Amino acid sequence: MRPRWTGSGSPVRVAQLADAAVLSGQRPLRPPRSPRTTSPYPFVPMSRPLRILLACSCFAASAALAQPPTTPVPTAPAATAALPSIATRTAGMVRRDGLFPLYWDERTGKIYLEIPAMDQEFIYFTSLPWGVGSNDIGLDRNQLGAERLVAFSRSGPRVLLIEKNTRFRGVSADANEARGVEESFARSAIFGFTVEAQDGLRVLVDATEFVVRDAHDAIGALRRTQQGTFTLDRTRSAVYMPHTKAFPRNTEIEVTLTLAGTNPGRYVRDVTPNPEAITIRERHSLVALPEPGFHMREADPRSAFFGISYQDYAQPLNGQFVQRFASRHRLEKKNLGAARSEPVKPIIYYVDNTAPEPIRSALVEGTRWWNQAFEAAGYINAFRVEVLPDSIDPLDVRYNVIEYAHRATRGWSYGGAVTDPRTGEMMKGHVILGSLRARQDFLIGEGLDQPYATGTEKAERVQAMVLARIRQLAAHEVGHTLGMAHNYISSAQGRTSVMDYPHPMISLKTNGDVDITNAYETGIGEWDKVAVTWGYGEFPGDEKKQLDSVLVAARAKGLTFLTDQDARPVSSASPNTHLWDNGVDAVTELKRMMTVRERALTKFGETAIKRGAPMATLEDVLVPVYLHHRYQIEAAIKVVGGVTYAYTMRGDGVAGPVSVPAARQNTAIDAIADVLSPANLALPRSLIAQLPPRPFLFEPTRELFDRWTGITFDPLAPGATIAAVTFDLLLNEERAARMVSQHAMDPALPGFSDLLKRMELHIFASAPLSAYDFTLAALVQRSYVDHVLTLAESAEMPLVRAEARAALVNMLGTTLRPGVTGRGSAYTGQLAADIRAWMAGNYKPAEKKVKITVPPGSPIGEW
């Protein structure tokens, strides 16, 4: 039978704690005391009146315990006779009727909330209508907070707003069993109110202090990012009535808050007129629960759908204790059982009308791609996209919105949702797109396309590339708000999903020029159609079996899913699952990309900037071109010590994990070493000659290369940057440990010591080099030894430490042996001295490691 949420209250909860204790062999919490003739406690004589009082108390307690539990009858408390009526108390105030009626007292600046009934659950969340504007702090305009399942509860003159605990449940028809679970786990009282007036069961409370507070925890965000100590200044905070509204199914209260602080950090100083006073706006949303009837779909790790989970203590011992369900919007066919049907109610998304053209139109076009997936799932016009009209509040829970947010520096875009914690039903999708991503993409395009031959061109090819990226970005973030996680393996399967992180696919024309016209795919991907069919398709009959068949059929076509946990860690093992990569084979694509990069750098010059721009700003455009292969290096490195695997289920017949073959690993090692060759690190001398120091008014930013040379451009620092990025990934201690383990299981596979030997041969290869190339090679050697020393010092696996130490000892007798003279002897001599000092306990690699700051990489567009 399909699970369908039919109630309007919380799920029934249960826990058989006593039985669980017996079954687990644990001692009961309060074991019955065995009969005994003497008390373990000293006897204290009691007077006769005290004995009578105690006896009466015990009798009363016994009688109370003997009574069956009763359901309280809603009645108005007797003590409320002295309370005024709501009409009397709110006379002269502005009333806004809705789910929770509001009363605004203009004279005192207070706002009152009418509570129609106690113990009725609803959803409460906060948001940030007016943000801070710093990507690093993270307090973006219209950012959503976490949703909470709450209810008002009254005790005499006090009303508490209680957050329910939805992580522990007992889904059972036995009310006592359910109550046992509910009472076993703590709830959270969010706020306490005093009753001001009453009409029967309806009460009025002063909500001013509840709403005029930092409920979104902006102060915490400032503290966590080390931006100073801030507190709420109530004298500079107030209810913001223009955006305080009440509707039949939601009540919205907005407030202006001023956070006062001392010693504000750099990020705050960058974005506020007075960094000691940060004035923002926060909103409190009180939302009715969705109507009953939402169909809960059991989660499947192969499907890419996010979800909710909870422990169900009412499950039998052989049942599924942890329950998991997919998070989805409510979508139903008008004609159940029809192969294709219009929906009962379509899913509609609104694009922020503050986004400028042509970006706004690109956002609309890219978001509309999702209708292709819903059509493939059997729907007709089930997914629509419109521009947000002025009459719709973007934070109103009734509307799905794509927000265009501005920040001082570039940063992530992301998609979120307001979700019913009981069922996983998505009530509101909400996307926040960082506007500076488009400008960063434009910068990338300028560097690759070199569009300014005369210096006044409009760079139309670059703009077309950026708009293609914006379309894909909109589709990606909306995918999250439809319930789907990243699918980072799709690039290795032919760019089959918008839920991947796409690197621009740049190629060379037949004449050798760089071609940016096919940078991004158009339209929804084949995997996305599979995911939407699994998540939103109608499956009459045996749903579980039919859902499984969707994923089995997809696998047969080569369409699978791996996500963040498989791609984001620097030690991750999948050779096919990466961020910002391209190509079916990571190493082959790295070699192709190196050819494109070489051509782009050879061509690079003043045609990358407009006429009249300071020549020093060439470096701004140079950085993404020089680091063009940055993420493909990471992808190729994951082949080393790599393991091919999938999310498998018992009985699906899918093979288990397999180590990447030795030949492919060794090819990857050689390709990575080639990246570090001086020829691939050096900049054209003609380009270096065009890069003056930064001029007046053009301060250096974190988007530029680090430098040891002060004000002048440092031609060595870019190469040192690539070396640092490469060795941080390649000589990761978990990757090293995996290579030790793989070699132990199969000696034909390269072990960690084999990796070190192979890299040493490449890095210390003797060849006639120019002074520039020789110095770059010395920096690579320094970085390599620093990383090996770090592993020898602090790797958690002892065998990794041992093999790293052995490699260092071997270097002292070969590459770094005494007596080496000539060019570079000072560099190699210092390396040898540092290794010997470490072996003597007089050198700490973590303290001595070459420090170089790498320019920010991610995002190239989304989260």
State what each model feature region is.
Residues 53-62:
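Bacterial N-terminal signal peptides
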Residues 493-863:
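Conserved catalytic/binding loops enriched for acidic/polar residues
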Residues 368-379, 479-480, 504, 634:
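Sec-exported extracytoplasmic/periplasmic mature domains
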Residues 67-355, 373, 382, 387-440, ...:
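Auxiliary tRNA-acceptor-end handling modules of aminoacyl-tRNA synthetases
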Residues 41-53:
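Bacterial N-terminal signal peptides that target proteins for export
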Residues 387-405, 468-524:
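The catalytic-center signature of Zn2+-dependent metalloproteases
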